[in-house]
Swiss-Prot record:
Glycyl lysine isopeptide (Gly-Lys) (interchain with K-128 in ATG5) crosslink residues: 96
Name listed for the protein in its UniProt record: Ubiquitin-like protein ATG12A
Family from the record: Belongs to the ATG12 family.
Gene3D superfamilies per the UniProt record, alphabetical: Phosphatidylinositol 3-kinase Catalytic Subunit, Chain A, domain 1 (3.10.20.90)
Organism domain of life: Eukaryota
Keywords: Acetylation, Autophagy, Cytoplasm, Isopeptide bond, Protein transport, Transport, Ubl conjugation pathway
SUPFAM superfamilies: Ubiquitin-like
Tissue: Ubiquitous.
The organism of origin for this protein: Arabidopsis thaliana (Mouse-ear cress)
Listed GO biological process terms: autophagosome assembly; autophagy; protein transport
One Pfam family from the record: APG12
Function of the protein: Ubiquitin-like protein involved in cytoplasm to vacuole transport (Cvt) and autophagy vesicles formation. Conjugation with ATG5 through a ubiquitin-like conjugating system involving also ATG7 as an E1-like activating enzyme and ATG10 as an E2-like conjugating enzyme, is essential for its function. ATG12/ATG5 conjugate has an essential role in plant nutrient recycling.
């Protein structure tokens, strides 16, 4: 008896909460569900399109900037809390 979550064809979705930092514009919608198999680069590209800016700094939990090749599910499993992965973004460097 297989459940949907154990099926290889099902992809776990991760809630990504995007939070503006510094003078960055606030998005109208701040929470998104994306497939966990996606790379973090997809989140970065999405933010660049939404903000119409190439200058973008992203941080997980206001602490560190992950490698764009990291999978979203790995970041969520290690740094997510309250059922979501918090990603802070800024147009200029916010944290060293």
């Amino acid at each position: 008896m297989a459940t949907e979550s154990s099926s290889p064809s099902s992809v776990r979705k991760v809630v990504v909460h995007l939070r503006a930092t510094g003078g960055a514009p606030i998005l109208k919608q701040s929470k998104f569900k994306i497939p966990g198999t996606d790379k973090f680069a997809k989140v970065i590209d999405f933010l660049r399109r939404q903000l119409h800016s190439d200058s973008l700094f992203v941080y997980v939990n206001s602490a560190f900037s992950p490698n764009p090749d990291e999978s979203v599910i790995d970041l969520y499993n290690n740094f997510g809390f309250d059922g979501k992965l918090v990603v802070n973004y800024a147009c200029s460097m916010a944290w060293g």
